[in-house]
Amino acid sequence: MRSIPGTVGCVLALGLVACASEPSSNPGGAGSGAHGGASGTGTLGGTAGMTSAGAGGALGGSAGSSSVGGSSAGTTSPGGGAGAGAGSAGQPTAGTGGSTAGSSGGGSGGAAGAMGGAGSGNAGMAGGSGTMGGAGTGTSTLPAFVTSAANDYWNTTGKLEMVTAGTPTLTVDATAKHQPFVGFGGCFNEMGWDALSVLSADDVSKAMKLLFDAKDGANFLYGRLPMGASDYSMSWYTLDDTVGDYAMDDFSIARDKEKLIPYIKAALAVRPDIKLWASPWVVPSWMQSGSNMKNDAQTLGAHALYMARFVEEYAKEGLTLVAIHPQNEPGYARVHWTQAQFIDFIKTYLGPTFAERNIKAEIYCGTMSKDPDDTNIAKAAAMDADAMKYIKGFGVQWNLQAAVAGLAAKAPVWQTEHKCGNYNFSTPYWDQSRYSSSKPQNDHLYGEESWQLIRDWIVAGVNGYSAWNMVLDTIGMSLDRWPQNALLTVDRSAKKLIVTPAYYAFRHFSQYLQPNAILIDVKGSTDAIAFLNPDGSIVTEIYNKGAAASATTLQVGSTTYQFDVPSHGWATVLTPG
């Protein structure tokens, strides 16, 4: 593993990194800014220190059974700030609008705040002076322990014991710190909402909670969306097909209002602080010559305006874009960009256009997927001082893992698309027979592969991780006739929601992670990974690829825990620091 100089102890979200000591005029404020935190301290939070006094209990709160809002009588152990609602008794993590409240937490539910803490911040985990988390001294319910194995997913009844003798098989070293990790997310696509539309309203709500709820779901914080069609739209389209409309007079997101925006708003109903980012798969055909992006100034200027209008029109719908990646896979068949052209577009057209129109969405150099072509684009952009005036991060996926370390020295790096195919390829590519029902689209082996991929990318140095499709039907066929996987699937004929093994692989990583958790070392196995949360708690993830359950002892600080990790399964342990 490696460290990113200057990032530990800082707050990061997409391209914005602000250390706790830096005053900022960006959203903050004592529980009232867009991301909570101490007044005037940092872009996404306040000064470091999760246990300092202040309103909002990150590990306190009342002991009632209400998961959102309101106080509830509990036992009277000291502490527990005024959290935004009581968490469910005995639950180890922050629920939406609630602190981590256990049966022994004192205090009462208090003022609103989407993720706990005093005030009205959209995503304010803090009401006091904690970085992305509030103060509070109440007793928590840690440790927590969850396992998953084939046909036995998200088991919270496993045995976790504290032991005093023997040599631990795994040791967490919280002093060996690496990059901050801002969170997980997935992509909104039309086909996902179309699949969900066959379900009852209750099941649609269940799906959104499984993905975005911070207490009873995967705790996703980020959402990707296409700018125009993706290969998982219902059909190919762009947002301005009027030939020669360089002024974007006919630009429209009317199509997005049919499926895409309702999908996003259903998720926002569960988690109002979702951070949205976008990239185009296609551009208006009049901007292309064949499959190549035209390179004249008028066209490139119009394309920059096209992206600016996208951000502005979404804002009118109450949807804020935090980042734009200029192209999904620049070498992909729909739109080809040369290396020089892509970089010039950012520094000469897109960056200045966003600046002129006061657009706050960050520009990422992404999404890059093909080595060496896309690797070379990203590396060249990182070395271009004029481009880096506008580039706030990099988006990489598929086989660009080896490029992460070098890019991370320049700016934050996101893994932007989890490996998604069900691998049943045939020729020609549009042949539906490439999908084989004899090989499950989302089987447990794919879940195991997913866990390892997430681990490998994080160890490589990424600061965030995105799934591809969050929801598809059970066939999962793209417009390019390539069947792909999703975290949740819908059986259209049975009108049934199915939770896949890959979903649980993601949730093992994501549920207990707080924004800006720090990757730390685990000694004893490469199949274990750990994070230090801003509130001081530690999340350890373990994978057992063996054919039998693995007896494991884990040392965290001065405490050693003993438990079993199931065969071909995962375990998550949430402990005090």
List each model region and its residues.
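Positively charged n-region of N-terminal signal peptides that target proteins for export
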Residues: M1-I4, N219
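Ser/Thr-rich, Pro/Gly/Ala-heavy low-complexity intrinsically disordered linkers and tails
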Residues: S3-C10, L14-T141
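Substrate-binding and catalytic surfaces of secreted/luminal carbohydrate-active proteins
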Residues: S140-V172, L276-A278, L305-V322, P330-G577
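N-terminal catalytic cores of secreted or lumenal carbohydrate-active enzymes
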Residues: A150-L321, D344, T348
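A short, flexible beta-alpha/helix-coil linker loop
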Residues: M191-D194, N328-A333
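Short, conserved phosphate-binding/catalytic loop or strand-edge motifs used
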Residues: P284, P326-E329
